[in-house]
């Protein structure tokens, strides 16, 4: 996919992977609109990269999503919708009665899954009207293997993965040219993963590999350890589960 001359909307674009993506999309000749919930972070992003357009919006809020669409439409529309926004709640034992289970799961599903569907639906006709356009949905290495510490987060990413595959096929049935990409990052060094142990890829390296996949029209973009986990889980699912869920994670859940 050609990025030069395209306009990209990045959700969760004020920090981490989203902000690094904005930087590299700009370097590849694209125009970039970012959105997020924190105005201070959006302002800082615009200070760092003055070419960025920033719009405060919460993807999990229907009213905000509609306002975002209206503003983007007034700016001339987009060619690429990059659903990057995601949230992760603290580990909690699902085997104990606790009202927090539902609240956390609902929060993660609203942002990580339902928010994506909402934006895709709002922008679909706009994207269909473009000569070359795309939707990028961000799932996870954990959409292949359950995680005890991120149980409902992983579940939200599995839901998004299945939705993404179906959306791609539905558009093919309609003979639509809108490309549907699934991005599967490994563990990346961001604010969200600060308290996580394990080898972390830098945002710069992750986004570089991501953009390389986009330019090659690689519809499923597995990066770094995600490639290894994908293959291992197909061959040795029990062993792979153990790698993702070491015994020390049991102690966290039991505490």
Protein language model regions, located:
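Conserved glycine-rich Rossmann-like NAD(P)H-binding loop of the short-chain dehydrogenase/reductase
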Residues: 28-43
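C-terminal helical subdomain
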Residues: 194-230, 234
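Conserved glycine-rich cofactor-binding loop
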Residues: 7, 12-16
């Amino acid at each position: 996919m050609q990025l030069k001359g395209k306009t990209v909307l990045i959700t969760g674009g004020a920090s981490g992977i989203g902000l690094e993506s904005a930087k590299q999309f700009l370097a590849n000749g694209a125009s970039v609109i970012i959105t997020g919930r924190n105005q201070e972070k959006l302002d800082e992003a615009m200070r760092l990269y003055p070419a960025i357009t920033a719009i405060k919006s919460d993807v999990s809020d229907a009213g905000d999503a509609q306002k975002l669409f209206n503003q983007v439409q007034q700016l001339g529309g987009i060619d690429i919708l990059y659903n990057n926004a995601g949230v992760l709640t603290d580990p909690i034992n699902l085997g104990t009665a606790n009202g927090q289970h539902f609240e956390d799961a609902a929060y993660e599903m609203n942002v990580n899954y339902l928010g994506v569907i909402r934006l895709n639906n709002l922008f679909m006709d706009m994207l269909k009207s473009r000569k070359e356009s795309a939707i990028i949905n961000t799932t996870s290495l954990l959409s292949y293997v359950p995680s005890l510490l991120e149980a409902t987060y992983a579940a939200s990413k599995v839901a998004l993965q299945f939705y993404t595959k179906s959306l791609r096929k539905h558009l093919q049935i309609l003979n639509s040219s809108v490309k549907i990409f699934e991005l599967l990052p490994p563990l990346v060094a961001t604010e969200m993963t600060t308290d996580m142990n394990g080898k972390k890829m830098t945002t710069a390296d992750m986004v570089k590999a991501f953009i390389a996949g986009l330019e090659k029209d690689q519809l499923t973009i597995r990066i770094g350890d995600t490639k290894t986990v994908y293959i291992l889980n197909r061959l040795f699912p029990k062993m792979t589960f153990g790698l993702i869920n070491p015994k020390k994670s049991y102690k966290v859940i039991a505490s």
